[in-house]
Amino acid sequence: MAIKLIAIDMDGTLLLPDHTISPAVKATIAAARERGVNVVLTTGRPYAGVHSYLKELHMEQPGDYCITYNGALVQKAGDGSTVAQTALSYDDYRFLEQLSREVGSHFHALDRNTLYTANRDISYYTVHESYVATIPLVFCEAEKMDPEIQLLKVMMIDEPAILDKAIARIPAEVKEKYTVLKSAPYFLEILDKRVNKGTGVKSLADALGIKPEEIMAIGDQENDIAMIEFAGVGVAMDNAIPAVKEAANFITKSNLEDGVAFAIEKYVLA
């Protein structure tokens, strides 16, 4: 069955290490779109960290979409307006922020427009997230957060060795109550239990009348597994972690070798 939608992770997949898109990848995405295929950037980033790439790829038309915050938000690519949203509550935030202190990790939280931290010793990785995602960073003590806030995800962030120790201390019931997954060695993302990239892709596909077998998903990290398993064609980058490769139907080349282009050529343009 022909592919009608391609869901592409950004960091480690679409993007080179310097956060640029190679000419070959741009060309194959454009060729797929010319054939009427929906190409959807599917990322843990907020819209602000995606918009410049959507513009670069000319993916801001009325029928273009993006999936942000690891599936918590499905948006129209042109203006960022909401198609579907699933958020964490203030009570979730207070519980998880306290948990981060108990397990020994830095912590931050994101709504649609702002990155919040209650850590006075703000982590380098929080600053890094603010820079890469081009989203403002605000210090706010946990008890002073707006009780009506709609947080799309929270994150434990730290040096990989410290974060791994913190993860090992997280009670099993927390991992059952929320979606808990790694997006990088220094990022642990925690979302509403109903949220992952797979549910985000499904929500959009249902709205567009596209079947799972008509979808290709490409990724490299733990947070990509759900959409790779959901898609009819799940593709792992050669630079992907082992669990992603195990979940995939096909292993393409690395992001340094235009792996996204190779997969699109094989399954869409051939």
What name fits each language-model region?
Residues 1-5, 22, 189-270:
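Mg2+-dependent phosphoryl-transfer enzymes with acidic/Ser/Thr/Gly-rich catalytic loops
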Residues 4-17:
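Asp-based phosphoryl-transfer active-site loop
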Residues 23-124:
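Active-site phosphate-binding/coordination module
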Residues 25, 50-54, 166, 170, ...:
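Hydrophobic packing residues within well-ordered alpha-helices of enzyme cores
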Residues 32, 43, 70, 154, ...:
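Residue-level signal for inorganic ion chemistry
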Residues 36-40, 64, 153, 213-214, ...:
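Short active-site oxyanion
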Residues 62, 70, 174-176, 230-231, ...:
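Short, structured coil segments at secondary-structure junctions
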Residues 99-218, 239:
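Conserved acidic, metal-coordinating active-site core of Asp-based
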